[in-house]
Amino acid sequence: MEALVVDAGSKFLKAGAAIPDQSPAMIIPSQMKRMVDDGSSSADNPTTVFEDVTLDPIERGLIRDWDAMEDLLRYVVYTGLGWEEGNEGNILFTDPLCTPKAIREQLVQLMFETFNVSGFYASEQAVLSLYAVGRISGCTVDIGHGKIDIAPVLEGAVQHIASKRFELGGTELTKLFAQELGKTNPSMNLSMSDVEKLKEQYANCAEDEIAYKKTQNCEIEQHTLPDGQVISIGRERYSVGEALFQPSILGLEEHGIVEQLVRIISTVSSENHRQLLENTVLCGGTTSMTGFESRFQKEANLCSSAIRPTLVKPPEYMPENLGMYSAWVGGAILAKVVFPQNQHVTKADYDETGPSVVHRKCF
């Protein structure tokens, strides 16, 4: 039985058997709805009324609701991927940057005590995203739904002192898009779900800052929503991508994403600058935005540093849109090594040491 690989993000959970040259078998929303008794039933009125409660098990990349996470994983491994209770196999999880030790321990405890897995392994997303493009050293720029992580990696080890997380991601870009659309379409009543879909369809990156300024006169497109409302979309589509290069658009006093990358790498020993900068990997759903990659490389070419960031192209045999699930693909590659070579946490390891064994065997 192939090991399972799970990459649980704030917006989507990616899971499937460890087959590296295929996309994950399951890509499902992480957000869940649970039916809850509203407490209105009584002896006089025995009719029970249920209401939908929306749950987000994962916030900004980290597990926050363990009961919901257990339900989500139960659905994934048993219903979605065909595990049978009493015959569970090995499982590998991707770890976001800055995952607290307590969360790692609680996850390994959940896997062995509730899911009764045969073996467990976890590895950091930055390392796995590099594995997906055939590298063990480089720097990942991961723009997720709830965060941006920039992490230098040397010989398969994340340089945590130099790494940086920004509490900014696709969620904030969606809110920005909603605000911008509201200015030009004041009578519209848009749900965040509508805005998210519009962002995915229309968001674009201008070629450079000068081109962005010229978008004030860009062509206006009309889009008809499912409810019949017609919305006008003009320059707003460019503000989403521009905010990553000019965070002041979001009201933040931060450097743009390329400048952040260069500054982060400059804190690592100078002898490693070249291999980090020349092996830059973009990952996360937002990086698939039209024009983002070319804008990133153009900004990189304008850097004042002696060595400029260069983006790594994924191998041709890898699945399309690799950046959207590169950590999962890297996890599938690693699973082919750690489980056959018995480098993982076994049930015997767990029984002997307890949850803290994860820090000794998974790094």
UniProtKB/Swiss-Prot annotation:
Q: Name one GO molecular function term.
A: structural constituent of cytoskeleton
N-acetylmethionine: residues carrying this PTM: M1
| Subcellular localization, as worded in the UniProt entry | Nucleus; Cytoplasm
In terms of InterPro entries, this protein maps to: Actin, ATPase_NBD
Coiled-coil-forming residues are none
What Pfam family is a match for this entry? Actin
Query: What is the purpose of this protein?
Result: Essential protein required during embryogenesis and all plant development stages, probably through a chromatin-mediated regulation of gene expression.
Q: Which PANTHER family match?
A: ACTIN
Official protein name in the record: Actin-related protein 7
Which organism encodes this protein? Arabidopsis thaliana (Mouse-ear cress)
